[in-house]
Amino acid sequence: MISVSARDDSTRGPAVGYADPLGEPFLRTRFAVPARPGTFVRRPRLTAHLDQALDTPLTMVNGAAGAGKTLLVADWAAGLGQPVAWLTNEAGDQGPGMFWAYVLHALHTAGTPLPAGIGGSPEGIRMVDHRLLARLADELNGRDRPAILVLDEFDRLAAPETAEQLEFVLHHAGRGLRLILVTRTEPLLPLHRYRAAAAMTEIRNQELAFTPEEAADLLARHGLRLPAHAARALVERTGGWAAGLRLSALAAQQSTDPETYLKEFEAGHSTIADFLLAEVVGRQPPETQDLLLRVSVLDRFGPELAEALTGRPDAGPLLAGLCRQNAFVEDLGHSWYRLHPLFGEILGVHLRARSPGLEPELHRRAARWLRAHGAVPEALA
C-alpha cells in the first residue's frame, strides 16, 4: 500500500525516494517534457488557449492518435517559465499505488515541496492510503503558486479508482493545483461539473486540426514549398490530422513531383496506413475491427445500418465507444456517424485485401436496408 507515516504536518523533507513501490528505479524518461523535433510547427492560437489552464483547475487536451496533443502541451510547458511536473503514463502500471508513486515523484522532480513521511511498500501497489491523498491535497492547497501537473497519455490508465482519487485531490487542492490531462478518450471525471462552473479548459480534435496555413508551414519545414491551394487540398483530405500531414510530407520528400504526389497518393499503401492500422485498428478487439472494415463501404451510417452489415446487435454501443475514443469515427448527430475520410479510404483498401469479394455483398446489404427504410436515392448511389 502506498502510505503516509504519522508525523507532524509541519515536517518537511524528501517525500519520495528513487525507487518505485516494487523497488525498481523510477524511469526518468517518464518525467521529461518531450523534445520538439526540428520540423515542429508552433501554433500560437493553441498555446494561447492553453494559457487559460493557469486559471482553471482542470484542462483536457483530447484528440485522436497523432493529433499533436503531446507536442502541443510540451511546447506550451517549455515556454511557460515556471516548473511543470510531467508524467507520461504507461499501460503496464500495476494499479493506483504505482500511479501515485509516479505522480509524487513527478511533483518532487519539478521541485514541489511535499510532506515528509510519504512512501511506498511493495506489498500493496494496487492500494492507496486515503490519508496520503488528503495530506497531498492539503499540502497543495496551502501553496502560494499552484503546482502544474501534466498527465500525458492519461487514457492508458484503466483503473476507475485512479480517476476517483485524482478527482478527490484536485477538488481539495483548490487553487494549489492545475491539472492538465492529455488523452485520447474522455477521463472518468465529473467533467460536467467543471464545465458548468467554468473551471475547465478544453482543446479537442476540431481545434487540434491544422489550418491550411499551419499545414503550409509544416510542409515548408520539410523542404516542400507548395501553392496555397495544394496545402488546402491536403488539409481537406487529411482533415488537418497532424500525423497524416507529417507522414505525407516525409513521403513527398522522396517524390520527383511532391505536389502531384500529395494530391494523388494512395493512402491505403502508405506510411499513414501503417500508422492507423497499428495505432487505431490494431488496438481494437476483433469484433470492432470487423465493424470498422465493414462500415468503410459507406459514406455515413447509423447503428441499425451497421447492424445490417455486421449482424451485430451491439453495433450501436460499439460505434458510440469508438466515437468517445477519438478512433476516427465522427458523430454527425441524430445517431449517425462517418469515418474520417482518410481512415475510411485506408480501411476500404484493407477490406479488399483481407476479404476479396466482400465489398459488393456489403453494398447489396446496405442497399436493401436503405430501400426498406425509404432512402431510395442513397440506395441507388
Feature annotation, model-predicted:
Residues 2-12, 16-25, 29-33, 42-46, ...:
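Alpha-helical sensor/transducer elements of the RecA-like P-loop NTPase core
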Residues 38, 42-52:
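Pre-Walker A adenine-sensing motif
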